[in-house]
Structures are given as C-alpha cells and as structure tokens.
C-alpha cells in the first residue's frame, strides 16, 4: 500500500516536472519581449536577438530533460517526440508576459518606472507606445478565451477557477493600460480579436432561437452598431488626423513603388520608397496636405504592402495562405484564444510594423504552431532552431553586433562633440558589423564630410541611401560635390532632396548657396531659392530657420554689390 502511494507521488512529481519544463521551454524564447538594453541606442533590438539565442539553448535543454525523464519512466517514442501541451504553454506564456507588460505600463503611468522614450509616458518594454499597445492587443483575446472557455463559475473546480481568475485579472490590467496608449490600430485589433473569440464561444442553439424570435430587433441593433462604428471611426480619425493622413500617403507611395518593382526590390523598403516619393513630388501634382504629412519612414506601416515591395507578391501570398491554414486548424481544435491573437496581430499589421520587432516575430511563429501542428513538430522545431543559431553562427554574429552597437554609443559621443578625427577612427572599426544600418552609415559619412574627406564621405553616404530614405543624406552628398567643385552633380543631388521632401527648407537654402557660387552663379535661380527660403512656412519653427534666412539675405546683399 505504502509502495503504491510512493509510486503515485513519484508519478505526480514526474508529470509536474514535465509540465513545468515544457512551459519553461516555450516561455523562455517568448520572454525576449521583456528584455531591454538601455546601454544601446534607443530602438535597437539586437539585444533581444542575443537573448533569444540563449533562450533557445535553454529551451533545448528543457526539452532534452523532458525526453530523458519520459525515457526513464518508459514513455513511448511518440509521446517523447510530441508536445501535446504546446498550445497551452504558448497561451499561458503570453498571458504571463502580457500581465508583466501591463503592470510595467501602469508603473510608467504613475511615475514608478521610466518609459522607453522621452516623448511618451507609456511604452512598456518597447521603444514607443504603438508596438506596446499591439502586443497587449494580441494577448487580450487569449485572456478572454481562457476566461470564457470553462463556462459558468459554479460548475468548475478550484484549479480551473484559478485559471479563470488569472486570465480575467490580466485581461482587466490590459484594459486599464490599452486606452492610455492612444494607438487606434491596437484598439481595433483588440476589439476584432475579442469579438471573434466571443462569437466562437457562443451557444449556437440559444443564438438560433433568439435570432428567430427577435430577428427585427437584432437587425435594428446591428444598424445602430454600424452607425456607432462609423462615428467611432470618424472620431479615431480626428483624434490624430495628420497621423492618419500620413499613413494613407505612405501606403499610396508604397503602392507606386510596388508598380516599379512588381516582383520585389532587393535593395529594401527605404531605397524603393525614397525613389517613389522623389518621383511623385517631382511631378508637382500633389495636394498641400501631402507635402505636410510626408516623411522619410523606415517602415511602410503596413506589413502586407512592405512584404510585397521587398519580397514580391508570391512570398506574401504564401505566408497568408499558411496563416489562414493554421487559423482553420486552430478553429477545428477549438483553440479560439490562439486564433484570436493571430487575428489581432494580422489586423494590427495593416497599420503598424510588428514584424520588424523580435517579440512579434517569435510570438507569431509560436502562435501558428500552437494552432495544432506544434503538438507534433514543436520539439524538432526548437532543436533545429538551436542547431541553426549556434552551429550556424547566428548567435556569435548577434553578439558581435550588440558589442558594436555598444561601442557605437561611445563613437557617437565623439561625433556629436565635434571630435571628427577620433570619431572617424571609431566608426571605421565598427563598419564591418554595422554596415547595414542607415543611421550609422549617415553618421560616418557626415563625420567624414566634416573632416574634409569628401570622396570617402560620398562612398558611405551612397550606401546609406539603400537603408534610409532621409533626404539629409542627399543634402550632405550635394555639399560634398559642391566642395569638390562638381556643381552640376551637387545641383542634381540637392534637387533630388527637394523632391523627396519638399516641405523642408534646408535643401532650398543649400541650393541658394550653390547658385551664389562664383563659378556656378545663376542669379535667377538664386532669387527663386531665396524667395522660397524667406516665404515658405516651416513645419516646425526654429532658430536654425531664422539663421538660414538671415544668411540668404546677406548673400543677396553681397551679390548686389
């Protein structure tokens, strides 16, 4: 009798250890969302990839430990390779991490923690409120599903009540924080994801009876809700109208870039977008609001359009088909929380950039696997990822890039202090690791420009144009050509800068100085540029604009002598 009791306890301990190890194997890679790297430049995510590499190694260790436990206790080979609780582990990992993020945000709101951006009070572990809100919106349907799935309170046991309460508390915490983020994209994503979960949990028999009995009433309710949604949509638009118009203009230019690169642009989004916006404004057939809201974005704020532009429509269609297939499988297995999270993420991706952040990429892959196929292949996937990351050298590459980004902070201090010779030496050492970062390449090129190395400066600035659409790069290249007395090339580059962002006054000021050069003197063009510099209304007024205007007036007086 005592021996049987001991065996039962050992079996329970083994099962608990297996569940705990499985949970840790899933939660550790997803936990990269909470990793912050204040020692790096704001917005850098390479530290999260370094953490991910270590987390995957830890997950592999957990899975190996589970397999050894199951082997020791005589489990079948099929059971050893399967991961039957993968979906539950993903769901509860997201709930746990979502709760941590929600508490993090509340602490920031009340001033107990610093935010990730000086302009925003609420960012969680992210750099700004947009992605933070998107992450919370993705987790909310999972919380709702686990709150609803066990039915009424009185018919569930103590452990299920604990799950229900935990999911409910995290959901309430998220609802406390989400409105304060002011992210309309995340609000819409959260609502659609949660409505889908509620719809899938409906009592079909009861709904059919009520529909037949109160059909006219429900139709009138539907019409009322439709009008409320229209008013709400208009309110969301007028909450930040320039932001909404900016997204629309951004998508318009991205679509024009797609027409030029219908099978994808291998040079990336920034290069293709910069070209398309420059071509659009050069036609001089645009509305005033378009000039006002135009910018030099790093992302398309629409993952589908950006994927088509950079990888081509075939890859985009393939990913959509895979996602829809996983959603169908998840619905068949009644994993409505996981499916609701995927739907929320898909909606959020229409007007944001989640797939540029490690936390969303890893969560997206885990959610797809959690729809059903992860029960079979999750363990091989984790083991394969570990082999690829560690044997393939990715972790070493990420670590070297992180170290370079840390050194970049010091080099940047030299650059901003005007110690350009020392900055150039530091940038040269960092170039092999950071050669695909547009901001780094611009700083290096601008530092060389300030030091008088104009040809070398153009070499790095030309590379920066591939990774960054900022017209300031064109301005510095134009100034380099002017210093080298290649005036026609300088004019071409500065006009390209004007066309890329016509709302900026600085390139007109540079053109005015160029046309005042004795060897390239053109009084008519100078007067035109002078008029624009003096009369054009700046987007943001500053003392620099006043200085440019005074200098142009002084140049005009010199030319009159």
Write out the residue ranges for each language-model feature.
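Alpha-helical transmembrane segments of multi-pass inner-membrane proteins
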Residues: 15-38, 52-73, 77, 84-118, ...
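Interfacial juxtamembrane loops and adjacent helix segments
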Residues: 114-120, 256, 267-309
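Hydrophobic alpha-helical transmembrane segments in integral membrane proteins
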Residues: 233-249, 387-417
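Alpha-solenoid helical repeat scaffolds
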Residues: 408-409, 439-443, 472-476, 505-510, ...
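Register position in tetratricopeptide repeats
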Residues: 416, 450, 483-484, 517-518
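Short coil turns that delineate tetratricopeptide repeat
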Residues: 435-436, 468-469, 502, 538
């Amino acid at each position: 009798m005592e021996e049987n009791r001991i065996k039962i306890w050992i079996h329970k301990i083994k099962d608990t250890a297996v569940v705990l190890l499985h949970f840790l194997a899933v939660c550790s890679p997803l936990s990269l969302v909470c990793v912050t790297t204040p020692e790096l430049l704001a917005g850098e995510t390479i530290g999260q990839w370094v953490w991910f590499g270590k987390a995957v190694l830890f997950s592999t260790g957990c899975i190996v430990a589970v397999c050894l436990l199951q082997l020791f206790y005589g489990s079948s080979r099929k059971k050893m390779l399967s991961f039957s609780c993968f979906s539950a582990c993903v769901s509860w990992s997201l709930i746990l991490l979502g709760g941590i993020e929600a508490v993090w945000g509340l602490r920031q709101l009340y001033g107990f923690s610093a935010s990730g951006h000086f302009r925003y009070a609420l960012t969680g572990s992210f750099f700004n409120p947009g992605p933070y809100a998107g992450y919370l919106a993705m987790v909310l349907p999972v919380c709702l599903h686990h709150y609803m799935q066990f039915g009424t309170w009185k018919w569930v046991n103590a452990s299920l009540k604990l799950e229900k309460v935990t999911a409910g508390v995290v959901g309430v915490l998220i609802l406390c924080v989400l409105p304060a983020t002011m992210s309309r994209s995340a609000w819409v994503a959260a609502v659609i994801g949660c409505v889908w979960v509620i719809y899938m949990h409906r009592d079909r028999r009861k709904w059919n009876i009520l529909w037949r009995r109160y059909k006219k009433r429900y139709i009138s309710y539907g019409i009322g809700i439709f009008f409320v949604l229209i008013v709400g949509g208009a309110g969301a638009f007028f909450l930040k109208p320039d932001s909404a118009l900016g997204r629309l203009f951004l998508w318009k230019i991205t679509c024009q870039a797609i027409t030029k690169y219908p099978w994808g642009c291998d040079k990336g989004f920034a290069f293709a977008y910069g070209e398309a916006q420059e071509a659009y404004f050069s036609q001089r057939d645009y509305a005033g609001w378009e000039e006002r809201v135009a910018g030099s974005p790093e992302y398309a704020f629409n993952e589908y359009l950006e994927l088509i532009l950079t990888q081509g429509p075939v890859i985009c269609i393939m990913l959509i088909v895979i996602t829809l297939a996983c959603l169908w499988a998840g619905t068949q297995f009644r994993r409505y929380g996981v499916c609701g999270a995927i739907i929320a993420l898909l909606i959020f991706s229409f007007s944001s950039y989640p797939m540029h952040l490690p936390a969303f990429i890893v969560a997206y892959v885990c959610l797809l696997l959690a729809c059903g196929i992860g029960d079979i292949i999750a363990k091989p996937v984790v083991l394969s990822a570990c082999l690829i990351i560690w044997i393939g050298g990715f972790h070493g590459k990420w670590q070297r890039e992180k170290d370079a980004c840390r050194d970049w902070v010091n080099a940047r201090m030299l650059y901003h202090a005007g110690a350009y010779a020392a900055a150039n030496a530091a940038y040269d050492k960092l170039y092999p690791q950071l050669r695909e970062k547009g901001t780094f390449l611009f700083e290096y090129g601008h530092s060389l420009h300030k030091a008088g190395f104009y040809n070398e400066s153009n070499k790095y600035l030309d590379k920066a144009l591939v990774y960054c659409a900022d017209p300031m790069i064109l301005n510095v290249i134009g100034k380099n050509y002017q210093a080298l007395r290649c005036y026609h090339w300088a004019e071409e580059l500065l006009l390209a800068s004007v066309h890329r962002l016509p709302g900026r006054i600085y390139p007109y000021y540079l053109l005015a100085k160029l046309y005042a050069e004795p060897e390239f003197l053109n009084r008519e063009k100078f007067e035109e540029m002078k008029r624009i510099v003096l009369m054009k209304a700046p987007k943001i007024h500053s003392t620099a604009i006043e200085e440019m205007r005074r200098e142009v007036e002084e140049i005009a007086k010199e030319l009159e002598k």
